[in-house]
């Protein structure tokens, strides 16, 4: 099980600049990913200031999401007590 679903999310978390992700979004997403990786229960994933974790409809395995800002979302799966396949998505 990999913590990140794609290279963009790995780059953002590790502080590598991406032209396709605004700097303010990258900083916020990195903080949120840190919370997801530290969580041991799904309830721990509530992001300070945003708070809501939503289960996405019709996904297998079950996928959850939380808003980073505006059109930017973090999606992830919850397996064996940890967030995996975390992905920063631009829905715009």
Regions found by a protein language model. Give the residues of each.
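Arg/Lys-rich, positively charged N-terminal/basic patches that mediate binding to nucleic acids
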Residues: 1-32
């Amino acid at each position: 099980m990999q913590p990140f679903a794609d290279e963009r999310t790995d780059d953002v978390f590790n502080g590598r600049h991406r032209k396709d992700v605004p700097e303010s979004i990258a900083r916020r997403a990195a903080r949120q990913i840190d919370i997801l990786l530290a969580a041991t229960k799904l309830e721990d994933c509530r992001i300070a200031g945003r708070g809501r974790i939503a289960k996405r409809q019709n996904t297998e395995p079950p996928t959850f999401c939380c808003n980073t800002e505006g059109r930017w979302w973090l999606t992830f799966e919850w397996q064996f007590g940890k967030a995996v396949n975390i992905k920063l998505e631009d829905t715009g």
